Amino acid sequence: MDSKKLEPFELLEAGRTDVIFAARQSRVNCDWTPLYYDAMYAILPEDYPVGGRESFPIEEFDGKEFLMPYGRFDIDVNAALSPKKVRPRVRPCHVDDETVIRMVSKGLGITMMTEIMMRGRTQGVRTLPVSPKAGRELGMGMHLSQNTPEEILRLRACVLDFTGGLS
């Protein structure tokens, strides 16, 4: 990682920000407010044989060409694959999510993304929720503190009020 580019949780831990909005990471301890569960989907070429299934077994990624989305998304993908000891042939993709989806549509591999990442970009591919169910929890992180400023508490209340219908 570029030392000049800090990830949200690193900024929070270093005290360089009061609030972050991110996908929850188990290794980080903070005051966490869950806001949305973002479900994982298999992204497959349109002609991928699914045999009428309505979900894609995680185990089926094993040994397949897997186009890994860019950024720290590998953390979420590995969290979904590890419990089943699934090991796809990972091909890191240093391009945006839409380009990864286009690569899948051209038969260059398969991938896994969350609903938010793929929303509105599924032309030319087939999408199925993975099974067992997997995803990431999106939320708001704050410092662990007994003296949280009133402004931050009001922000959290406002965010919870606004997102109440999104889950």
Model segments located where?
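Central regulatory/effector-binding core of bacterial HTH transcription factors
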Residues: 1-27, 94
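Short loop/turn segments at beta->alpha junctions
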Residues: 4-5, 57, 95-96, 114
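Hydrophobic residues within well-ordered alpha-helices
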Residues: 12-13, 61, 102-108, 140
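A ligand-binding cleft/hinge motif common to bilobed small-molecule-binding domains
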Residues: 17, 23-30, 79, 97-126
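Flexible hinge/capping segments at coil-to-helix
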Residues: 30-40, 44-66, 150
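Short beta-strand->loop
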Residues: 31-41, 111, 115-116, 123-138
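Secondary-structure junction motif
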Residues: 64-89, 148-156, 166
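A late-sequence structural motif
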Residues: 127-167
